Amino acid sequence: MDVIIRQARKEEASQIAELFMLAWPVDDILESNGLTYEQLHESITLIAANEETIYSYENTIVAEIDGKVAGAMCAYDGADYQRLKQPIVDVLGPDCGFAKMKETEAGEFYLDSVGVLPEYRGRGIASRIIEAQCERAATLGHKVAGL
C-alpha cells in the first residue's frame, strides 16, 4: 500500500468534507441546525472548495492511497481563525457550535480536523498527515503548532 501525502486539490472538496465530518459531532450539528447529513455534506463541500475558509482545500493535506483520498487534515494560522471561520457560521448559522468556539489565536499554527476513512485506520495515516502539517507550519515560519 503506497501512501502519498500531498496538498489537497479543489476538485477533492467533497472527499475532504466527508473526512472532516468523520472528526466532528455530526449528529449534534444536524440536530442543532435541522439539516440532513446530505445537506451538511453539501454545505461543507462548498466551504472546502472556497479559498478563504478554515476547511479550505488550500489549508488541507491529504493521504492518497491507490488514487483515493483516504485521509485529510486542515491547519491554518491562528491569527486568521475569526476571519476564516465566518463562512462556516454564515452557512450553519449563529447558533452553531462553530460560532461560539475559539479554538486558536495569533501565535499558533492550528492543527484542526483530521479524518481517515474507517477502512484505512490503524495504519499510521493520521500520524503522517499531522507530521506533514507540522512541516508545513515550520516552512511557513511558525514556531508553535497546536492540536
Predicted features and spans:
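Conserved acetyl-CoA pyrophosphate-binding loop and the N-cap/start of the following alpha-helix
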Residues: 120, 124-132
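Hydrophobic adenine-recognition pocket in adenosine-nucleotide-binding enzymes
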Residues: 8, 114-116
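A short helix-loop-beta-strand connector motif used in the catalytic cores of GNAT acetyltransferases and
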Residues: 49-62, 79-83, 110
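Conserved GNAT acetyl-CoA-binding A-motif
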Residues: 107-109, 130, 137-147
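Conserved GNAT-fold acetyl-CoA-binding loop/helix
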Residues: 25-48, 58-59, 83-85, 93-94
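Conserved acyl-donor/pantetheine-binding loop and adjacent beta-alpha core of acyl/acetyltransferases
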Residues: 74-113
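Conserved N-terminal entry element of GNAT/NAT acetyltransferase domains
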Residues: 1-11, 22, 31
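Glycine-rich acetyl-CoA-binding "A-motif" of GNAT/NAT acetyltransferases
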Residues: 68-71
